[in-house]
């Protein structure tokens, strides 16, 4: 396994503000910029800057029906019982057919 790129020691040194020296990891010609994150607004957009208001808009939505697991299980059980009755009737008729063929 190769040498780790970032170790706990390197993180601690960076947090203290020390320079971390070492061989360049990538040969790229792009400049690395360090952005300060001490600003209280860093990462958050200010709604006033974009013309948004803080008011909550009420949107009219049709009430939707949420089916619970209990309802779904009940429907599945009803379907399974009907299916079992049909299968029982088909098997019973097949047995009667086989018996009728033997008697003839």
Curated annotation (Swiss-Prot):
NCBIfam families: accessory_MacP (NF038277)
Domain comment in the entry: C-terminal transmembrane domain is sufficient for its midcell localization, but not for the full function.
Descriptive protein name: Penicillin-binding protein 2a activator MacP
Record note on disruption phenotype: Synthetically lethal with PBP1a. Deletion of this gene with concomitant depletion of PBP1a leads to progressive reduction in cell size before ultimate lysis. Cell wall synthesis is also dramatically reduced in these cells. On the other hand, cells lacking this gene are unaffected by the depletion of PBP2a.
Bilayer topology term: Single-pass type IV membrane protein
Subunit field text: Interacts with class A penicillin-binding proteins PBP1a and PBP2a.
Gene giving rise to this polypeptide: macP
Modification type Phosphothreonine: residues: 32
Side of membrane Extracellular, spans: 104
One of the record's GO cellular component terms: plasma membrane
Alphabetically ordered keywords of this record: Cell membrane, Cell shape, Cell wall biogenesis/degradation, Membrane, Peptidoglycan synthesis, Phosphoprotein, Signal-anchor, Transmembrane, Transmembrane helix
Function: Required for the in vivo function of penicillin-binding protein 2a (PBP2a), which is involved in the biosynthesis of cross-linked peptidoglycan (PG) of the cell wall.
Top-level taxon in the UniProt lineage: Bacteria
Sequence intervals crossing the membrane: 83-103
GO process terms (BP): cell wall organization; peptidoglycan biosynthetic process; regulation of cell shape
UniProt KW Thylakoid keyword: no
Keyword Transmembrane in annotation: yes
Positions in the Cytoplasmic compartment: 1-82
Subcellular localization, as worded in the UniProt entry: Cell membrane
Organism: Streptococcus pneumoniae serotype 2 (strain D39 / NCTC 7466)
PTM remark: Phosphorylation by StkP is required for its ability to promote PBP2a function.
């Amino acid at each position: 396994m190769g040498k780790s790129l970032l170790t706990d020691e390197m993180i601690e040194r960076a947090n203290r503000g020390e320079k971390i020296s070492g061989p360049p990891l990538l040969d790229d010609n792009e400049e690395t910029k360090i952005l300060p994150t001490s600003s209280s607004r860093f990462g958050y957009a200010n709604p006033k800057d974009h013309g948004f208001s803080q008011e909550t808009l009420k949107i009219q939505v049709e009430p939707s029906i949420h089916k619970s697991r209990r309802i779904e299980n009940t429907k599945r059980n009803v379907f399974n019982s009907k299916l079992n009755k049909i299968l029982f009737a088909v098997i019973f008729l097949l047995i009667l057919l086989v018996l009728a063929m033997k008697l003839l």
